[in-house]
Amino acid sequence: MQEFTNPFPIGSSSLIHCMTNEISCEMLANGILALGCKPVMADDPREVLDFTKQSQALFINLGHLSAEKEKAIRMAASYANQSSLPMVVDAVGVTTSSIRKSLVKDLLDYRPTVIKGNMSEIRSLVGLKHHGVGVDASAKDQETEDLLQVLKDWCQTYPGMSFLVTGPKDLVVSKNQVAVLENGCTELDWITGTGDLVGALTAVFLSQGKTGFEASCLAVSYLNIAAEKIVVQGMGLEEFRYQVLNQLSLLRRDENWLDTIKGEVYE
């Protein structure tokens, strides 16, 4: 498997602007802090540009969308495009909400660095048949052959963009590369916000100069490996959640953590 460059220690305490939902806000803030960066969450149109202009990466999560938040998202995305600020868009709930799907497609004009979603969300976004309900992926949507071909075509249209598709096997697709990543554990599905956290960690690695492809691979693998280290039979939900955040701060001290990434990268 391709050797990625270790992003640690974080070279600068970057400011990561997360426009996210209220449910996962605290987890994302703590996750970003655990990696050595600083979070800020501002989604009021009156101040959103003040914070975006100070940030080194922008993470947009469509959970809990409102008319005011949509206005702020469009303002921040436009600035990110004009200033070449790395941007991650998490397409939460596009399987169900036509408003969210339309917004994500509009955001493509602002050239996001990474589009993230689960298997059902990304299939819905690119026009493939899907069975997603609410914000959850369906087990029926795990076929990847048709999805990979469509994503490759989209990356030709948007050559600077990568897709991060989470599932039992995580996919990362760019114009020239495909990664199939196999770390992780089912316990991550026990607690809300872990998918959102992957997007925030992707923004962290983008702030350190990583490409969209490499930042996506590093982010999803980092969280999955951290979770693998703490799986203990009989552990309760709250303890597991606490230990996930705890391990995020500890794993970066392991100079060999990249060696535990499972999967393949194809040109």
Curated annotation (Swiss-Prot):
Gene, per the UniProt record: thiM2
Cofactor(s), by name: Mg(2+)
Binding residues annotated for substrate, in chain numbering: M41, G193
Assigned keywords, A-Z: ATP-binding, Kinase, Magnesium, Metal-binding, Nucleotide-binding, Thiamine biosynthesis, Transferase
UniProt GO molecular function: ATP binding; hydroxyethylthiazole kinase activity; magnesium ion binding
Family: Belongs to the Thz kinase family.
Enzyme class: transferase
CDD domains: THZ_kinase
Keyword Kinase on entry: yes
Function: Catalyzes the phosphorylation of the hydroxyl group of 4-methyl-5-beta-hydroxyethylthiazole (THZ).
EC number: 2.7.1.50
Protein name (record): Hydroxyethylthiazole kinase 2
Pathway involvement of the protein, from the record: Cofactor biosynthesis; thiamine diphosphate biosynthesis; 4-methyl-5-(2-phosphoethyl)-thiazole from 5-(2-hydroxyethyl)-4-methylthiazole: step 1/1
Keyword check for Transmembrane helix: no
Domain of life the protein comes from: Bacteria
Residues reported in the UniProt entry to bind ATP: K116, T166
Position of the signal peptide: none
Single biological process term from Gene Ontology: thiamine diphosphate biosynthetic process
Catalysis: reaction(s): 5-(2-hydroxyethyl)-4-methylthiazole + ATP = 4-methyl-5-(2-phosphooxyethyl)-thiazole + ADP + H(+)
UniProt-listed Pfam families: HK
